[in-house]
Amino acid sequence: KHYVRGQYEGYLQVPGVAAKSTTETYCAMRLQIDNWRWHGVPFFIRAGKSLPERVTEVRVVFHRPPPLPLTASRNEHPRSNEMVIRIDPSPGASLQLVAKAAKSHNYRNIHLDMDFADEGGEGPTPYEELLSAAMAGDKDNFADQSAVEETWRIVQPLLDDPPPVIPYAEGTWGPAEADALTRGYGGWHLPWLD
């Protein structure tokens, strides 16, 4: 099972929503790309309404390093380094490294963070960017027909035979069942927020 659908408790009381609606307000999935370059690399996606934060980010979690022979404890196993690209709110990037502290055998987390607005000023909003590109005839930010068809090929089986909608509490990160998707991969990560 690689797909979880959820609906926040209280959604059915929203004006205009059918009393027995099975429309999801949350989804989480684990995807694989079927080629040699990405073989064995999982891609996790989750999105939803009434979550604790409104944030869009891409997080690359690198392979966890093996236990190092010269550490204070033979059982010490550093966590994975991560690169986070925050798209919204306030675009930025963060490199989160595990490094050995000077004159010590202990590891600590080091964050190299950059808020793009601090460096280059506030840019246009994503909608302003898309509208400007559309008016200029720039197709780079828009999906072509082959990408749209491939997306439908991937999601159509989920639409044809969807799993049940699982209720989740407002202000949480979705149904607990979604945690099973990331089991063995370090779990879901909280978003990088300032």
Q: Where in the sequence are the language-model features?
A:
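Secretory/organelle targeting and membrane-embedding segments
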Residues: K1-D194
